[in-house]
UniProtKB/Swiss-Prot annotation:
InterPro entries: Ribosome_recyc_fac, Ribosome_recyc_fac_dom, RRF_sf
GO MF: ribosomal large subunit binding
A GO term from the CC aspect: chloroplast
Function: Responsible for the release of ribosomes from messenger RNA at the termination of chloroplastic protein biosynthesis.
Signal sequence region: none
UniProt GO BP: plastid translation
Source species: Oryza sativa subsp. indica
Full protein name: Ribosome-recycling factor, chloroplastic
Length: 266
């Protein structure tokens, strides 16, 4: 607002000067003249009475003002950087979950002998549980048997006892030098039981994948609370993460189907 100027009584009593040509509005035929813009004139003054004067002011009040903080939109580069870190970590963990499922499937025996059948066997060796493969060499001389040769022959009986207790459906025999494990043909009922075991292991893997996805979503939500991502950003990133989750779910289903086919093969 331009400053107010006080003038003398004599000046106030003087007749007002005519508006300059710049302040006049040109006349046009058929048009109503507009009001002259006297507020913009350099000769515009406010006449005040002589004597003490006081000026009052009030604070400016903005109507309908929005006091909420405005979220700065993240750049594409920032969004991609956050996505890369979180999604890469999720993929890495999901890959490990797939490996775990595959290793668990390998322990489920089919109609053929496979050293992986004994991967979960742990022997109480000198008071400490150790994996069988760390204290013995395991070979496959033929399709129906395994040959276990311990590095310490004193552990033969302990290994034999542990294999029997594992209830793998195999028959170990100890000749004092090695342990021969005979893998009998699978019966129809046994195949069905093993198929259920495979389905259970697959579901455990899917649960692990879902938990990994949940952790990644929590990481995105944390960035939203920190004002580093918007709600729309999180929705888009969550949708991309769901595609990754679906991808690994299909991988589990594929290896599960493959294992079930091996079980049903006679």
């Amino acid at each position: 607002m331009p400053p107010l100027h006080a003038v003398s009584p004599a000046a106030a009593a003087a007749p007002p000067r005519a508006l300059s040509s710049a302040a006049r509005v040109p006349q046009r035929p058929g048009c109503v003249p507009e009001r002259p813009n006297i507020l913009s004139s350099s000769t515009n003054f406010m006449s005040l009475r002589a004597g003490p004067m006081r000026f009052y002011s009030r604070p400016l009040i903005l109507q309908n003002s929005d006091k909420r903080a405005v979220l700065r939109h993240a750049t594409i580069e920032e969004i991609e950087a956050e996505k890369s870190v979180i999604e890469d970590q999720a993929r890495e963990r999901m890959e490990k979950a797939i490996e775990t499922v595959q290793n668990n499937f390998n322990t489920v025996r089919t109609g053929r002998a496979n050293p992986a059948m004994l991967d979960r066997i742990e022997v109480e060796y000198y008071g400490t549980p150790v994996n069988l493969k760390s204290i013995a060499q395991i070979n496959t001389p033929d399709a129906t048997s395994l040959l276990i040769q311990p590095y310490d022959k004193s552990s033969l009986k302990l290994i034999e006892k542990t294999i029997v207790a594992a209830n793998l459906g195999v028959t170990p025999s100890n000749d004092g030098e090695v342990i021969r494990v005979t893998v009998p043909p699978l019966t129809s009922d046994r195949r069905k039981e093993l198929a259920k075991t495979v389905a259970k292991l697959a579901e455990e893997g899917k649960v692990a994948i879902r938990n990994i996805r949940r952790d990644a979503i929590k990481a995105y939500d944390k960035l939203e609370k920190e004002k580093k991502l918007s709600e729309d950003n999180v929705k888009d990133l969550s949708a991309d993460l769901q595609k990754v989750t679906d991808e690994y779910m299909k991988k589990i289903e594929a290896i599960q189907k493959q294992k079930e086919q091996e079980l049903m093969k006679i």
